[in-house]
From Swiss-Prot:
Record gene name: ptaE
Record's keyword terms, sorted: Copper, Glycoprotein, Metal-binding, Oxidoreductase, Repeat, Signal
Phenotypic effect of disruption: Abolishes the production of pestheic acid and RES-1214-1, but accumulates isosulochrin and chloroisosulochrin.
Sequence similarity: Belongs to the multicopper oxidase family.
CDD domains: CuRO_1_MaLCC_like (cd13854), CuRO_2_MaLCC_like (cd13880), CuRO_3_MaLCC_like (cd13901)
Induction or repression: The cluster is expressed in rice fermentation medium. Expression is correlated with the production of pestheic acid. Three regulators are located in the cluster (ptaR1, ptaR2 and ptaR3), suggesting that the production of pestheic acid is controlled by a complex regulatory mechanism.
Protein name: Oxidoreductase ptaE
């Protein structure tokens, strides 16, 4: 469990983090969490490349492999990091440099791999974003790759494999970058990874899904790799009988901070703790004005830093359930909503009393907190739109029958999702960064879904994502009418935070007015079932950046595009960094491996690749 960490730091009120404005006068304590050190604080403009404190080098080694695990008391062959699920916490301070060596030990299933550092902008280090087929070729089994980058943001996040569905089998862990907070707290409880869990291999489940158009239903929900699945060990050898809810013990009169991360495969969760309110102080990597709520939706990939204060009205032997239910109305009992226990320090070990869910929780829906309630501390104004945005440019989510373009994939016609016309399909051996820097070609196949953003640094681009639109006349690859299915879609952008100009239910129409004055800013947003989101971000980070639904099955089945941002600027950046040689070597090694091992063993790419 994390303990409170006190940093000797100084405080100023800089204008865009200007060193001249810093007075170095404040210390980071339980009474001044908005301070950090060396004049850096909650108001520092962390989007400037140099706007982070001087830091140290922090090194980690992560080995990805397979082993039998039973986080909810039922055994399955999972994917682990350093022999554990979830993987170990990557922990650093704002301004540190992380050097992480990732080793691929998937020697039995012939899987490549790559690790994505979710929410880390990778400013001018696009090739370290960890997306096979987009920013790199996969790491071959038995090989390793070093990811080294400076962390200029702070808060709570996670790392995960971005190779097909590996993270759904367990290949992920938390990231904590310590920095200032927008409200005071006493003790840091660390990251809480909230996840749905299956008892079958995610790759196999997805194959069933795309051939039958039936989504796989999770078996249980977990916090930090702990959960409770009801089974009988006398009748099922895989039922180990060792299962536990995640528990925390709190002390009266104390403010606790924790970061909640939805690391699920399919479920957006509605989260609450019986008898308690909590205060949101950050969304993704963005500190906000404190917002007190009693219930919170957490989409896949979203993070919230939260403060919970123990209730003086409760006895010190009280205990309470933590709840996480599927957000979709009328399907809230898809898994048991009890996911953990909060105990006050003198409470025993018995289960808390169960409080029946009210209509408030049953009908809470899948919406993010109201946009007007999420006010970033560091203010940003949205500039004028540089890109064309007619209705035909909207990113519309649909479902249809398609065939994967890879000749080695023999699945034939399958049910695939798409974002604007075609499902994404990347070539692991020919990632976009390779095309832009080594091959220097604009030959991007249609299914690689490239959208070029060749604008000047500082300009703004706007995009609309719709899940409620009229598909009349739109047909799939086999001439069947496209379907619009009511599903929540948590969309994640790599390489940027975006600003949310508007968000809601129903169709997006031209009379909707954008909020351009310091709107909510984050990297993952929920598009409600049959809803829309209007976003904008600033051109300032050359590279190939994935934008995708973070329901793992949806991303695997095609809901993604990639932005090619200032493509001509990427090669000079990589040449200056001296990384093109290693990049090419990794692709050559992967291509040789894939041709010599994967294809003969029928272990070929069977989905979008991401």
């Amino acid at each position: 469990m994390f303990q409170s960490i006190l940093f000797l730091a100084f405080y100023g009120r800089p204008v865009f983090g200007s060193a001249a404005a810093r007075d170095y006068a404040c210390v980071n304590t339980a009474e001044s969490r908005d301070c950090w050190k060396d004049g850096f604080n909650i108001e520092t403009d962390y989007y400037g490349k140099e706007e982070a404190p001087e830091g140290k080098l922090v090194e980690y080694e992560l080995t990805l492999s397979q082993q039998i695990i039973s986080p909810d008391g039922y055994e399955m062959l999972g994917m682990v990091v350093n022999g554990q699920y979830p993987g170990p916490t990557i922990e650093a301070d704002w301004g540190d440099t992380l050097r992480i060596t990732v080793k691929n030990n998937f020697t039995e299933n012939y899987n490549g791999t790559a690790v994505h550092w979710h929410g880390i902008r990778q400013k001018e280090t696009n090739w370290l974003d960890g997306v096979p087929g987009v920013t790199q070729c996969p790491i071959t089994p038995g090989d390793s790759q070093v990811y080294e980058f400076r962390v200029t943001q702070y808060g709570t996040s996670w790392y995960h494999s971005h190779y097909s569905l590996q993270y759904s089998n367990g290949a992920y862990g938390p990231i904590v970058i310590h920095g200032p907070s927008s409200a005071n707290w006493d003790v840091d409880l660390g990251p809480w990874l909230l996840s749905d869990w299956y008892h079958d291999d995610a790759f196999a489940l997805d194959h069933v899904g795309i051939t039958t158009n039936r989504a796989a239903i999770p078996k249980s929900s977990l916090i930090n790799g702990k959960g409770y699945y009801e089974c009988d060990p006398t009748n099922d050898a895989k039922c180990t009988g060792t299962r536990d809810y995640y528990e925390v013990v709190l002390k009266q009169g104390t403010k606790y901070k924790f970061g909640i991360i939805n690391t699920s495969t399919i479920l957006t969760y509605t989260f609450w703790i019986d008898g308690h309110n909590f205060t949101i102080i950050a969304i993704d990597f963005v500190p906000i004005e404190p917002l007190t709520v009693d219930t919170l939706n957490v989409g896949i990939g979203q993070r919230y830093e939260i403060i919970i204060e123990t209730n003086p009205d409760f006895d010190d032997d009280s205990s309470f359930w933590m709840h996480a239910q599927y957000c979709f109305i009328n399907q809230t009992d898809i898994v048991d909503d009890k996911v953990g226990i909060v105990r006050y320090e003198s409470a025993g070990s018995s289960d808390p009393p169960y409080i029946n869910k009210s209509d408030y929780h049953l009908n809470f829906g899948c919406a993010d907190p109201k946009p007007e309630s999420l006010v970033p501390i560091l203010k940003q104004q949205v500039g004028a739109q540089a890109n064309p945005l007619a209705a035909e440019d909207y990113f519309r989510v649909g479902l249809g029958n398609f065939t994967w373009p890879d000749a080695t994939n023999s699945t034939g016609s399958v049910f695939l999702w798409f974002l604007q016309k075609l499902p994404l399909y990347v070539n692991w051996s020919e990632p976009s960064v390779k095309k832009l820097t080594i091959d220097e070609t604009a030959d991007f196949p249609p299914n690689s879904r490239p959208i070029e953003l060749d604008y000047e640094t500082g300009q703004w681009v706007y995009f609309v994502i719709e899940s409620d639109w009229d598909p009349a006349g739109a047909v799939d690859q086999y001439g069947q009418e496209i379907r619009v299915e009511p599903s929540v879609h948590p969309f994640h952008l790599h390489g940027h935070d975006f600003l949310i100009l508007a968000q809601g239910l129903g169709k997006f129409t031209s009379d909707i007015q954008p909020n351009l004055d310091n709107p909510p800013r984050r990297d993952t947003v929920d598009v409600e079932p049959l809803g829309y989101v209007w976003i904008a971000f600033q051109i300032d980070n050359p590279g190939a950046w994935l934008f995708h639904c973070h329901i793992a099955f949806h991303s695997s089945d095609g809901i993604a595009i990639q932005f090619l941002e200032q493509p001509s600027k990427l090669k000079p950046i990589m040449e200056e960094a001296g990384v093109l040689g290693d990049f090419a070597d990794r692709c050559n090694k992967w291509d040789d491996w894939y041709q010599a091992v994967n294809i003969p063993h029928n272990a070929t790419q069977a989905d979008s690749g991401v």
